[in-house]
Amino acid sequence: MAKAVVLHHYWNEPGGGELVCSSTAIALKAMGFDPVLASPMKIDVSKYPQWYGISLEDFETYSYPIDLKAFGIYLRLFVGNVGKRAAEKFNAEIVFSDEATSRRALKELRERGIETIEYIHFPLEAAVNEDYRKKGYFYGNDPYILERYGRFPMNLYWWVYKKILPQFTGINPFDASNLVLTNSSWTGNIVREVYGEKPTVLNPPIPPSMEIVERPRDFEEREKSVVMIGRYSEEKRYHWVIEEVLPRLLREDPEIRLYIIGSSSTPHSRAYVSRLMKLAGSMGIKISEKEECSESICLLLNAPSELKLKIMDRSRVFMHATVNEHWGIAVAEAMARGIPAVIHRSGGAWSDLAEDGRNALGYVDGDEAADAVLRLMNNE
């Protein structure tokens, strides 16, 4: 059976990239290929059935014999080398990658006659090139980057990465790959702006573990709660919701509860959880990390999928606060469960999922967000 390498920088944490790459492996298997999972880091797919309802245990893997969580952005620079080695070892006919730093390797493999595919979650050049600062794409505007890499010594760590990066990129993806894919029409327009060609839009899938509900629970059977889903990280803007939206909701109805469900498995994410706890405490808002939570804010860290579905199905409103979300798997999941959604009017989540307001309510500032949540909370 012909081999197909699926290349990803780190397989061992749940996220949108991992869902896309694991689903790609399953699709290649269905097409008659034998997928090989590749990464600079040791690969552990044991939790994929729990995360997504996807099993990758039968697939071969290829990686360096290291397992580091530190220096993660630098390890991305070695993705292309791993891809070339895996393609050579397994005599692969296809190499799929979602990492821009593998582009030089993809071009070399393509020139050897191997079919190459790149999936662009967001064009890296737009994210690191200051020419795009005014358009809001530049990573220097990103709250996650500012928080994590804005102060010494991490700002030096980030500066060195940006200096090294051009040695691994600088190639048009349409020259490097036979097929260029992206996650949304919004991202696709930016790809065309940066590289001069428009990619094929292939929306990320809903995980098999996320059943599409044909008949959602009636409004009267749902509790007065808002649910947010996504890893604990600054770009999800949970702190903004607690500061700018929740106080207004609680003034209107003290019984409203905010659930935040997401993964927290790194020191940085745990520090963000601590920040949320302190923020709520300073505002006099009761907050808890317990599964059986009766406070105004319930932080559910690394919750099992059964609990996540249970809370989604009994909540009245789903809220998404990320600005310029490239796609928004959490938004797609909420829609699959039939929860009315409130989404920031930006990015692929707004263009492709909300369809510019046809499928969800939108907002820009805190007051508009609170108004939208209260409309849905009161079934107006």
What are these regions (language model features)?
Residues N302, K310-S315:
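Short alpha-helical donor nucleotide-sugar binding micro-motif in glycosyltransferases
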Residues L181, R217-K236, V241-P247, L258-I261:
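Conserved donor-binding/catalytic core segment of Leloir-type glycosyltransferases
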Residues M41-I43, R257-I285:
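Glycosyltransferase donor-sugar binding loop
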